[in-house]
């Protein structure tokens, strides 16, 4: 249980941020994603989840920045890139209707 209280664990910070995002508590979600990315700028899941959070508030440009970061990080295809790319495409498609 001590891992849950470790502010230096990027995985835990990402999971907490993800949980806040699912609860639509975006201020603490963004704070946790930022902390995770400060500790590990190459944290793929944090980039994916932060990109999805940006779409929740309608910030497509910021979401695409995280997609670009994933493209640089993932030397071979990775699920996080594919998932965020899919969510962005769906967002763009729904915005056109």
Language model segments and positions:
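Structural marker of alpha-solenoid helical repeat scaffolds
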Residues: 5, 39, 72-76
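Canonical tetratricopeptide repeat
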Residues: 15, 49, 83-87
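Register position in tetratricopeptide repeats
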Residues: 22, 56, 73, 87-94
């Amino acid at each position: 249980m001590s891992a849950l209280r470790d502010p230096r664990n990027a995985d835990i910070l990402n999971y907490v941020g993800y949980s806040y995002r699912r609860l639509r508590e975006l201020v603490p979600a963004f704070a946790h994603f930022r902390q995770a990315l400060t500790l590990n700028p190459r944290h793929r899941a944090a980039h994916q989840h932060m990109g999805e959070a940006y779409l929740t508030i309608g910030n497509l440009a910021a979401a695409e920045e995280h997609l670009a970061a994933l493209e640089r990080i993932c030397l071979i295809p990775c699920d996080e890139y594919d998932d965020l790319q899919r969510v962005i495409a769906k967002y763009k498609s729904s915005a056109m209707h």
